[in-house]
Amino acid sequence: VFVALILAIAIGQSEAGWLKKIGKKIERVGQHTRDATIQGLGIAQQAANVAATARG
């Protein structure tokens, strides 16, 4: 992040806007990945509960 910031300042404002757009895209992908992981964990937990109930 620090290196990208230095590059943005060195290259100029137009390039900084470009870097910001890429940063937003990466951030959005990260959020989707996090949400999918949380959902996956929830489903895995439910499956484990069902298996435990079936065994018990």
From Swiss-Prot:
Q: Which InterPro entries match?
A: Cecropin, Cecropin_insect
Question: Has UniProt tagged this entry with the keyword Secreted?
Answer: yes
Pfam families found in the cross-reference section: Cecropin
* Highest taxon of the lineage: Eukaryota
Q: State whether keyword Secreted applies.
A: yes
Q: Which residues carry this modification: Arginine amide?
A: R55
Q: What is one term from the GO cellular component aspect held by the record?
A: extracellular space
Give the keywords, sorted.
Answer: Amidation, Antibiotic, Antimicrobial, Immunity, Innate immunity, Secreted
The alphabetized list of GO BP terms reads: antibacterial humoral response; defense response to Gram-negative bacterium; defense response to Gram-positive bacterium; innate immune response
Where is the protein localized? Answer: Secreted
Its family remark reads: Belongs to the cecropin family.
What is known about what this protein does? Cecropins have lytic and antibacterial activity against several Gram-positive and Gram-negative bacteria.
Query: What PANTHER family does this protein map onto?
Result: CECROPIN-A1-RELATED (PTHR38329:SF1)
Q: Any idea what this protein is called?
A: Cecropin-A2
Species of the source: Drosophila yakuba (Fruit fly)
Query: Which gene codes for it?
Result: CecA2
